[in-house]
């Protein structure tokens, strides 16, 4: 996945129609995309300039810790570390890596944050896009240096048992950034907010009209932007993964930016969009990608077994078809 850069799906924000409360809107660049924050003003809250200064600092810290586009970031330094000796990392990076490992198990290996060399080989990372589709020999060489089983956590350190192991947290760290900002807003006494970074969102409370925040899930169309569903997630985070915008074509074949760890190639299934709800945007972010890799049958089976609210949009000969897990269906009926 092009790190920090491409929002896998656009989620449109909708409001109600009662007399509006005072709403503050903050925005800015981060992680190769943008952030948008809306919150309802309350007595005793710090002024918006003070809040935004701290939000920018927090997001810059996430970049300094986890961006693979910054050669001196904590994660980049670990990737450049070719020894099997433990490498000390921050509590924040450790938290995100731990969740990535947990989600790897939950998705039966479909979410693997060590596929960075394959992502780069296909031209969706810091490396330039290849002039031709990679050969089997090139794929096998990159696959030999991937696998989350080669990554170990001990205390506050990470270690690897193959020197070339490369960790790319782009499938999960953007959601972490949303959580960092949302947690900060709550620490400041803000009870009604929407935090969005590159399409990943966390919500709490009510919007300016005194009704729950409403989110539009985009129809997975390349040519135009339109709405597939409108939901009220409540106090949940929402993340969507899709392959319908970030891809390249060669010789009439479309290659998605989402890589299947088992083949080393871009995914090749009928699922074009996966939306996940969770209390943590980091978790929703990672699950959306992992379930997309798994495909319709396996992905929905995992969603049902673990009571995960999931909406899959699948391409058929007649257009698009929705598949909602049992935990997601109540959100569709609101």
UniProtKB/Swiss-Prot annotation:
<keyword id="KW-0274">FAD</keyword>
<feature type="binding site">
    <location>
        <position position="289"/>
    </location>
    <ligand>
        <name>Mg(2+)</name>
    </ligand>
</feature>
<protein>
    <recommendedName>
        <fullName>FAD:protein FMN transferase</fullName>
        <ecNumber>2.7.1.180</ecNumber>
    </recommendedName>
</protein>
<keyword id="KW-0479">Metal-binding</keyword>
<feature type="binding site">
    <location>
        <position position="171"/>
    </location>
    <ligand>
        <name>Mg(2+)</name>
    </ligand>
</feature>
<feature type="binding site">
    <location>
        <position position="31"/>
    </location>
    <ligand>
        <name>FAD</name>
    </ligand>
</feature>
<dbReference type="Pfam" id="PF02424">
    <property type="entry name" value="ApbE"/>
</dbReference>
<dbReference type="GO" id="GO:0016740">
    <property type="term" value="F:transferase activity"/>
</dbReference>
<keyword id="KW-0732">Signal</keyword>
<feature type="lipid moiety-binding region" description="N-palmitoyl cysteine">
    <location>
        <position position="17"/>
    </location>
</feature>
<keyword id="KW-0285">Flavoprotein</keyword>
<comment type="similarity">
    <text>Belongs to the ApbE family.</text>
</comment>
<keyword id="KW-0997">Cell inner membrane</keyword>
<keyword id="KW-1003">Cell membrane</keyword>
<feature type="binding site">
    <location>
        <begin position="110"/>
        <end position="112"/>
    </location>
    <ligand>
        <name>FAD</name>
    </ligand>
</feature>
<dbReference type="GO" id="GO:0005886">
    <property type="term" value="C:plasma membrane"/>
</dbReference>
<keyword id="KW-0564">Palmitate</keyword>
<keyword id="KW-0460">Magnesium</keyword>
<keyword id="KW-0808">Transferase</keyword>
<feature type="binding site">
    <location>
        <position position="168"/>
    </location>
    <ligand>
        <name>FAD</name>
    </ligand>
</feature>
<dbReference type="InterPro" id="IPR024932">
    <property type="entry name" value="ApbE"/>
</dbReference>
<feature type="signal peptide">
    <location>
        <begin position="1"/>
        <end position="16"/>
    </location>
</feature>
<dbReference type="GO" id="GO:0046872">
    <property type="term" value="F:metal ion binding"/>
</dbReference>
<keyword id="KW-0449">Lipoprotein</keyword>
<comment type="function">
    <text>Flavin transferase that catalyzes the transfer of the FMN moiety of FAD and its covalent binding to the hydroxyl group of a threonine residue in a target flavoprotein such as NqrB and NqrC, two subunits of the NQR complex. Cannot use directly FMN instead of FAD as substrate.</text>
</comment>
<dbReference type="InterPro" id="IPR003374">
    <property type="entry name" value="ApbE-like_sf"/>
</dbReference>
<keyword id="KW-0472">Membrane</keyword>
<feature type="binding site">
    <location>
        <position position="259"/>
    </location>
    <ligand>
        <name>FAD</name>
    </ligand>
</feature>
<feature type="binding site">
    <location>
        <position position="285"/>
    </location>
    <ligand>
        <name>Mg(2+)</name>
    </ligand>
</feature>
<feature type="binding site">
    <location>
        <position position="69"/>
    </location>
    <ligand>
        <name>FAD</name>
    </ligand>
</feature>
<feature type="binding site">
    <location>
        <position position="174"/>
    </location>
    <ligand>
        <name>FAD</name>
    </ligand>
</feature>
<feature type="lipid moiety-binding region" description="S-diacylglycerol cysteine">
    <location>
        <position position="17"/>
    </location>
</feature>
